[in-house]
């Protein structure tokens, strides 16, 4: 799995899969992962979409995996003040790079560094 900033309020965990399963299978898998995280660590995570039920917890937005759902692509500029970028980051940076912590200047600087998603397209994972 790979990590990127959203350029907004959260992070996105991206898993490269071979296209072998349909939308329903991916959606069900993402929902189940969110449910397990919520059950195992209820004080930390929630899969509940209601904002008033998730205060102080990390929201696992499994619905982003449904057909027709949208998500910002890596390296995309956000239409927000400060020219924030959805930027691939290394897992080791999770504690130091905020979800909206990469602006266009920082993104351009990072392009000259090692790619934290190196090997992404060589993954051979399949969801059954």
Roles of regions detected by a PLM:
Residues 1-7, 48-52:
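Short beta-strand
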Residues 5-15:
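Short, conserved phosphate-binding/catalytic loop or strand-edge motifs used
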Residues 10, 20-22, 67:
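Generic "edge-of-domain/loop-turn" microfeature
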Residues 24-128:
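C-terminal accessory nucleic-acid interaction domains of nucleic acid-metabolism proteins
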Residues 14-26:
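Catalytic palm subdomain of template-directed nucleic-acid polymerases
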């Amino acid at each position: 799995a790979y990590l990127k900033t959203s350029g907004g309020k959260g992070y996105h965990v991206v898993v490269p899969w071979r296209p072998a399963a349909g939308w329903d299978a991916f959606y069900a898998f993402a929902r189940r992962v969110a449910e397990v995280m919520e059950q195992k660590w209820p004080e930390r995570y929630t899969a509940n979409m209601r904002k008033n039920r998730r205060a102080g917890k990390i929201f696992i937005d499994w619905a982003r995996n449904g057909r027709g759902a949208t998500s910002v692509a890596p390296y995309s500029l956000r239409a927000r003040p400060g020219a924030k970028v959805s930027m691939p980051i290394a897992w080791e940076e999770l504690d130091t790079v905020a979800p909206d912590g990469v602006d266009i200047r920082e993104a351009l600087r990072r392009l000259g560094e090692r790619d934290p998603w190196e090997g992404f397209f060589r993954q051979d994972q399949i969801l059954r």
